[in-house]
Regions:
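Acidic, His/Gly-rich catalytic cores of divalent-metal-dependent hydrolytic chemistry
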Residues: 157-246
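Beta-strand-turn-beta hairpins that frame and shape the catalytic cleft
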Residues: 1-4, 129-136
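Divalent-metal (often Zn2+) His-rich catalytic cores of metallo-beta-lactamase-fold enzymes
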Residues: 135-155
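Divalent metal-coordination and catalytic microenvironments
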Residues: 8, 45, 60, 74-75, ...
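Active-site neighborhood of divalent metal-dependent phosphoester bond hydrolases
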Residues: 34-37, 49-129, 133, 157-158, ...
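Residue-level marker for buried hydrophobic side chains located in beta-strands
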Residues: 5, 40-42, 71-72, 136, ...
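N-terminal active-site segment of His-dependent metallophosphoesterases
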Residues: 1-57
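Active-site environment of divalent metal-dependent phosphoester hydrolases
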Residues: 12-14, 48-51, 78-81, 144-145, ...
Length: 246
C-alpha cells in the first residue's frame, strides 16, 4: 500500500483541499479518492486555530464512516474530546476558535457534532503501525523503546505532546527535547506537532508539521517514496511560532 501522510491541518480546510488535489486526489461522494489506489493518512490536529475546524473534522468523520481513516490524534484532538465530554478546559491555545464555530451551530447540529466527535475519537488508535511495521504515524513522534508496548500514560504523553522536559517557554508552550536525534529504529516515523519551516528529516524520521496555520505550508510525505509535497498557506505568517533546531 502507498500512503500520502498529511501534517497538522489546524482548520486550514482550503489548503487541505489544494494539497489533496496536488497529490492527485479527487472528491468522489465527498471522499478524497486517488486513481492509483493510494491512501491518505494524518498526523492529527485537524482542528483549532484555523478558520475551518468543523469542516476539516467532518471530512475525517466521512473518511472514518467509509473505513478509510488513518489518523493519529494529537493534543488538540484530545483537548477537544475532553471539553466535549464536559471536562473543565481552559479555552486558550487554539481550542477557543473551534468552540466559537460550535457556538454558531443550531442546538441540534451542535448536539450531533459533539456525539459524533466523541465516537470519532474513541475509535482512533493512539498511533499507527503500517506496512508490516516499517511505517509509524504518531502525532508528536514515538521513542523506539515505546513502539509496540502496551498502553501507558508514558506512551500517551509522548505521542500527544512529544518528549517534554517539564519546563516551559516564555509564551507558555512546553520545552521539548529533540527526540528524533536519538532515534535509531528501523521503522520510518512520520510525525508533526512542532512547527518547522520545512519538512525535517532526521535519522529515519520526518516532521511534516510545516505550520500551515501560522502562514507556513501544508505538507504531505509520500510513502514509500519519501517525497515531500507542499502547498503554501493562506494564513498570515507568524515567524516566532516555528522551531529552528541547531
Amino acid at each position: 500500500m502507498k500512503y500520502d501522510i498529511i501534517g497538522d491541518i489546524h482548520g486550514c480546510y482550503d489548503e487541505l483541499l489544494q494539497l489533496l488535489k496536488r497529490l492527485g486526489y479527487s472528491m468522489i461522494n465527498n471522499i478524497p479518492t486517488h486513481p492509483n489506489g493510494r491512501s491518505i493518512a494524518f498526523v492529527g490536529d485537524a482542528m483549532d486555530r484555523g478558520p475551518n475546524s468543523l469542516k476539516t473534522t467532518e471530512l475525517m468523520f466521512r473518511l472514518q464512516d467509509e473505513g478509510k481513516l488513518i489518523y493519529s490524534p494529537g493534543n488538540h484532538c484530545n483537548k477537544l474530546y475532553r471539553y466535549l465530554k464536559g471536562n473543565k478546559i481552559q479555552l486558550q491555545y487554539g481550542i477557543e476558535t473551534t468552540v466559537a464555530e460550535l457556538d454558531l451551530l443550531s442546538n441540534q447540529d451542535r448536539i450531533y457534532f459533539i456525539k459524533r466527535y466523541i465516537e470519532f475519537y474513541d475509535a482512533l488508535r493512539l498511533y499507527y503501525s503500517l506496512d508490516d511495521g516499517k511505517l509509524i504515524i504518531a502525532h508528536a513522534g514515538i521513542r523506539e523503546n515505546l513502539i509496540g508496548t502496551s498502553y501507558s500514560n508514558k506512551l500517551r504523553s509522548f505521542v500527544l505532546y512529544g518528549d517534554v522536559t517539564g519546563e516551559t517557554l516564555p509564551d507558555g508552550r512546553p520545552l521539548r527535547r529533540d527526540w528524533a536525534k536519538q532515534y535509531n529504529g528501523e521503522a520510518f516515523i512520520v510525525y508533526g506537532h512542532t512547527p518547522v519551516e520545512d519538512a525535517r528529516f532526521v535519522h529515519n524520521t520526518v516532521n511534516i508539521d510545516t505550520g500551515c496555520v501560522f502562514g507556513g505550508k501544508l505538507t504531505a510525505v509520500r510513502y514509500p517514496e519519501k517525497e515531500i509535497v507542499s502547498i503554501p498557506s493562506l494564513q498570515p505568517f507568524i515567524a516566532d511560532r516555528f522551531t529552528r533546531f541547531p
